[in-house]
Amino acid sequence: MALEVKYNAKQIENKWYNYWMENNYFHSEVDERTPYTIVIPPPNVTGVLHMGHMLNNTLQDVLIRRARLQGFNACWVPGTDHASIATEAKVVAKLKVEGIDKANLSREEFLEHAWEWTHKHGGIILEQLKKLGASCDWERTKFTMDPEMSASVIKVFVDLYRKGNIYRGYRMVNWDPEAKTTLSDEEVIYEEKQGNLYYLNYKVEGSDDTLTIATTRPETILGDTAICINPNDERFAHLHGKKAIVPICNRVIPIIEDEYVDVEFGTGCLKVTPAHDENDKALGDKHNLEIVDILNDDGTLNSFGLHYEGKDRFVVRKEIVKELEEMGVVSKIETHMHKVGTSERTGAVIEPKLSDQWFLKMKELAQPALDAVLEKDVNLVPEKFINTYRHWMENVRDWNISRQLWWGQQIPAYFYGDGKEDFVVAENIEEALKLAQEKTNNNALKTSDLTQDPDALDTWFSSWLWPISVFNGILEPDNKEINYYYPTNDLVTAPEILFFWVARMIIAGYEYRNEKPFTNVYLTGIVRDKQRRKMSKSLGNSPDPIDLMETYGADGVRVGMLLSSPAGNDLMFDEDLCKQGSGFVNKIWNAYRLIDGWEVCPDKEQSQSDVIALNWYKSKFQKTLAEIEDHYGKYRISDALMATYKLVWDDFCSWFLEMVKPPYGEKIAKKTYEEVISVLEDNLKILHPFVPFISEEIWQHITKRDTSEALIVSKWPKAQPFDEKIIKNFDFASEVISGIRTIRKEKNISFKDTIELSVLNNDNASKDFDAVISKLGNISELNYITEKLDGALTFRAKSNEYFIPIAGAINVEEEIAKLTEELKYTEGFLKSVQGKLKNERFVNGAPEKVVALEKQKEADALAKIETLKASLAGLK
């Protein structure tokens, strides 16, 4: 079948993806081969494909396709994450549009809506990944709320609780008033923001004295339960044992003493609000202070807010300052830069809040995971992230794992009374009943007497088990799949979830398998625009990946994404990269169209130039293959692509095909053609991980193949010894060919016209390639001479001098005039450069690079003058 003139990406991509799916090439089963396993970082079930997903999944597909070609049993497990906060927010918003308030629904009713939403939107991003060419084992697709996955999470919670690692505590937590849930410390993003520092005067009870405190949050004075001073601060010695009065609410509070107060900072007086600040809570515990919580879960003030009850905290801030000013309590207001914690999910300003929550003790669990990275059992790529990882793991805090949400795994704690300890933890209510009866010595307890904790577990508490749970390794720890596929090989993910997810997976791996979950962690950079801004919907600077693939084809976009994506460094994305990728795909297509159009002659002998060209390219291929293997080994995927790109574009298309291409109207020798096809097939194998669609299309067009011979399951090229000398000699020969082409172009000598070439040979490096030089330069006669040739144009390549007789080809007088003018200009340029180099102040004062550049200019000018003089001598 004749090839289309233009590569039709859409048609070809659909054809081959369907073919791969129909023939089950992506599916893996346990067998005798060595496994190569990747688990996908599960995108949010609510998500659609963005540029970060494109980069991350292209990298994974490159690794998995290469492993498949290398003969490994390649298994790439896809799936999605239930994303508690994000999904619940979307469902609540949808219900609001429909006029339904979540508060009026039971948990079961709300979950029906959540599952409906999930079934409707959950598959979108995975379908989009298929357009990219992702060769996931779709039969293994997992969702973190699948029954098996959820059961694994519950089992782990119960196990860790019984080991004493999970506890329930009344602690200061990060509260997101928009999502109405707690967040872990890692889910809080701190940003420098400009605010105000308000100086407020508190009256001292029973006197005319006042104390001045400074606060950035004047609305919280309604929760103040003490003023703290340093016992060594002589300014306030007279206030020991006294009390102060909180403005507006007129609460009488003690003036306490504690060395925690820095006498040099602010006014030396500290307002203590134990319900709304972690440090204040510690002071409150130490001094037995009352706790007054002024906020509702949605960030509005409660009854302790007095006449501000029901108003948002930020509205109250403005109004309370106005009231305090009218009372004469505000002594001054200063602008102030300070760090403000915001929710990683909703962007809302976080409130420190005291709450009964569930926590996982991390210090002891984290140690094996820290050792694994420091001892290189788990490799972070690039290594610059090791110190960041170590710092976090050495300072790890207990993980708040409960969330005030309904969407997610419900915490398996069952309460049988009103006391804080009146609960049991069990995998199901039947088991919980037995435990509750034992704990209370009350066999009359019934399941109806038990109430399950309404909170859900943090989403990360399910995804930290991902490499184990996708193979059912929690529920069936000795099943054949977990024993075969675990530990996985490579994880490709973003540095921003190094702690949210990667570190915790390593912790879970050692806790539940006594083994690392993966060997290598490839940390991608952030995709940014040309102005170095992170791509985001809100900025409107992120192109739609589906639109990009429609325009440039999936292969083109894959190449574009990878051309500038070194591990751990940010990718400065420019759509021109996709254009370049598409151009590369078209180059491959046109190269094959050229080959496919050749007529083969079975009886024609292979020419010397063909033999040389094939020997050179095979060596060049093997040398590049070694470089590519090295890049893959070091996870320099963009470098592996660039080496492949240069080999195919420059060496194969621009040089090799020109060297073996039969002259116009002639046929190609059968032996040459077969060897060209053989090296083309090797090219397609190393191209396949990067451009799977076009490589499979060409592979299948070369000859009829059955399903076992598809490119996707072919064999990666074997490393072979290569001839460094022939590569070096070609580099020299290519200089000679370029010199001939330059003279033809400059002197308007048509390529159709044959020319003679004489070589004053001081270096024999080009002799092996004489046949190639003659073919590509259209040389009628190539001679080796011992003296310079008169009446000829000349150029140099290393120590060889080349002469092209020009009798009748050019106007000699015009050429002499032109060369004389060029010589004069070059001599003038040389004089100015040498003037600089004779100036001691310049040589001693300028940077080394600048001086070196001038010396290079001098050397280049001297060489050019010598060539021009030789050309003039030859013409006179």
Residue ranges and their predicted role:
Residues 29-91, 144, 153, 213-215, ...:
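N-terminal catalytic cores of NTP/NDP-binding nucleotidyl/phosphoryl-transfer enzymes
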Residues 259-261, 287-299, 405-408, 413-416, ...:
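Alpha-helical recognition segments enriched in aromatics with Gly/Pro capping
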Residues 208-272, 278-282:
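Protease-associated
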Residues 1-51, 74, 331, 344, ...:
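Non-catalytic terminal extensions that flank enzyme cores
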